[in-house]
């Protein structure tokens, strides 16, 4: 089917029919949406979703998927009659050390805006693809920092009532790569993020540096604070080496980033693993136990960079970073799920640890 623009039907939003979703996601897989509604303002997001949710409750609308950057989602190939609401509101407001970013804002643009204003706290999260609205959903984190460290509140649309309100961070149940906002299947989200507020450091210093690879790159000690722009540059260099900065010409970046989260296990499981391998197992303290490095587990279980090594395979592990499942061109969501299951099951068979996916899976499952 060819894409057909049909004009504006909902709250002034842009509407098109028969739109391939693959080009709108960083993994570049997905079905053709029956309807794509692009919302450029918060009022449009609210108006469109209220209308569509009313229709769905009356049985007059098929499944509705809400997304923005498409960087942390795998959408099943066979989803039919799908209506997609693309959140594209992108205003950023700075008031002293408080920064409010609308949900559709490109995340890295938020980071840049804060650094340009001399605010620290987000520099370690540079280069992460996707939108500002996705960051609280999975409590985005990298290089020793999580967004929950600086989020004060989130503006939400409650889809059951249509109400819009600011919800304090304390009510969002933030955890490792999760929040109360992620506790639902992708087509049944009870609330949609409209805007996020951050409280940042106006002293001109970065967040405390805790990640060994980053402190080494900067020649600093753990716990020290750096100049935010210098920290950003170091983070981008590290991410680029791992294929974690989007580049249309580099298939290693055609991914959702790390596909599996680092597992948190009981101390005795870590001790068993260390005894089993006879190696120094990378690990970090976690509130509920010991956090292991999923990439290390993959490689020790036989799933090294570039697995399965077949140059004709449409989906392979990145040649730069084993945790990234990449589309080498022409892959489908089914191809991604096959490789993900192979890796998950292989790690479980070797180590007795079941890895969990980091992206939101819509219309597909491991």
Swiss-Prot record:
Keywords: Cell cycle, Cell division, Cell shape, Cell wall biogenesis/degradation, Cytoplasm, FAD, Flavoprotein, NADP, Oxidoreductase, Peptidoglycan synthesis. Its cofactor is FAD. InterPro entries: FAD-bd_PCMH, FAD-bd_PCMH-like_sf, FAD-bd_PCMH_sub1, FAD-bd_PCMH_sub2, MurB, MurB_C, MurB_C_sf, Oxid_FAD_bind_N. One of its GO terms (biological process) is cell wall organization. It is an enzyme of class 1 (oxidoreductase). Pathway: Cell wall biogenesis; peptidoglycan biosynthesis. Pfam families: FAD_binding_4 (PF01565), MurB_C (PF02873). Cell wall formation. Belongs to the MurB family. It catalyses: UDP-N-acetyl-alpha-D-muramate + NADP(+) = UDP-N-acetyl-3-O-(1-carboxyvinyl)-alpha-D-glucosamine + NADPH + H(+). One of its GO terms (molecular function) is UDP-N-acetylmuramate dehydrogenase activity. One of its GO terms (cellular component) is cytosol. HAMAP family: MurB. Its EC number is 1.3.1.98. This is UDP-N-acetylenolpyruvoylglucosamine reductase. Residues 29-203 form the FAD-binding PCMH-type domain. It comes from Mycobacterium ulcerans (strain Agy99). It is found in: Cytoplasm. The active site is at 177, 258 (proton donor), 358. PROSITE patterns: FAD_PCMH (PS51387). It comes from the Bacteria.
């Amino acid at each position: 089917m060819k894409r057909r623009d049909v004009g504006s039907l909902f709250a002034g939003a842009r509407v098109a029919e028969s739109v391939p979703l693959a080009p709108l996601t960083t993994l570049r897989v997905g079905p053709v949406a029956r309807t794509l509604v692009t919302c450029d303002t918060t009022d449009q997001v609210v108006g469109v979703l209220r209308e569509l949710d009313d229709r769905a409750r009356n049985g007059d609308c098929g499944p509705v998927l809400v997304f923005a950057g498409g960087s942390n989602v795998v959408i099943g190939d066979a989803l039919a009659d799908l209506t997609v609401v693309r959140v594209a509101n992108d205003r950023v407001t700075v008031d002293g050390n408080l920064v409010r970013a609308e949900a559709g804002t490109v995340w890295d643009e938020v980071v840049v805006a804060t650094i340009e204003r001399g605010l620290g706290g987000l520099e370690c999260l540079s280069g992460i693809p996707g939108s500002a609205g996705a960051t609280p959903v999975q409590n985005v984190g990298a290089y020793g920092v999580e967004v929950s460290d600086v989020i004060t509140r989130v503006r939400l649309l409650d889809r059951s009532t249509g109400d819009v309100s600011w919800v304090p961070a304390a009510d969002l149940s933030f955890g490792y790569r999760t929040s109360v906002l992620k506790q639902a299947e992708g087509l049944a989200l009870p609330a949609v993020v409209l805007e996020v507020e951050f409280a940042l450091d106006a002293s001109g210093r970065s967040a405390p540096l805790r990640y060994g690879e980053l402190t080494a790159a900067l020649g600093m000690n753990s716990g020290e604070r750096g100049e935010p722009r210098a920290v950003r540059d170091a983070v981008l260099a590290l991410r680029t080496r791992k294929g974690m900065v989007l580049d249309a010409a580099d298939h290693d970046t055609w991914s959702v980033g790390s596909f599996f989260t680092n597992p948190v296990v009981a101390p005795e499981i870590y001790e068993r693993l260390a005894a089993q391998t006879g190696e120094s197992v990378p690990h970090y303290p976690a509130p509920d136990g010991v956090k292991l490095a999923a990439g290390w587990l993959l490689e020790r279980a036989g799933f090294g960079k570039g697995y399965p090594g077949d140059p004709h395979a449409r989906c392979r592990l990145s040649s730069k970073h084993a945790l990234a499942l990449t589309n080498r061109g022409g892959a489908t969501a089914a191809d991604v799920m096959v490789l993900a299951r192979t890796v998950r099951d292989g790690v479980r068979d070797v180590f007795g640890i079941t890895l969990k996916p980091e992206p939101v899976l819509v219309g597909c499952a491991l």
